[in-house]
Amino acid sequence: MANTTETANLCGLKRENFQATINGKKTDLYILRNRKGYEVAISNYGGAICAIMVPDKDGKVANVIQGHDSIKQLMSGNEPYLSTLIGRWGNRICKGQFTLNGKDYQLAINDGPNHLHGGAVGFNAKVWDARQMGPRALALHRISSYGEEGYTGELDITVEFTFTDLNELIIEYLATTNKKTIVNLTHHAFFRSEERRVGKEC
């Protein structure tokens, strides 16, 4: 069964490079493996997809996603949204302002005069609670508190990643709230058509 205790994997990523304690919460690297032996590597920091190891058109196993080599790289800020979860709101909100049920709200500003991808500290920069559900599935969970980045309502979010035997990576989102709010969740996965070894351009 695939789990975080494995030291050998197709992508060559080292689990210890993804382990840290951030605001009292531990980060780690999770390996999903399907019955064909191919793999997906995911960090619970930002739900970052760090590797997807599948065959290319010539049958050569390659990492087809632009990922990260370590928690340090994930937190560097150079590419904060690269292959991570995005929320509470994917894309820009002009001037960080929206109106809901006749009430105006002001969100955090982090992209010129606008609000981008959930604010200055969006879901991409949060440590999620992780639960591996067998070798091919991972659930990430967190609660976004009332007022986080200016949003109204508490938002309870679960994101499930499932790696099928057809080499499909399925991402499902479930969010519930205790108050009317806005939400637009997505994953900012960046794919490459050519092979990329983790950490180096080919």
Ranges and model annotations:
Residues 2-200:
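Surface-exposed acidic/polar loop and edge beta-strand patches at domain peripheries
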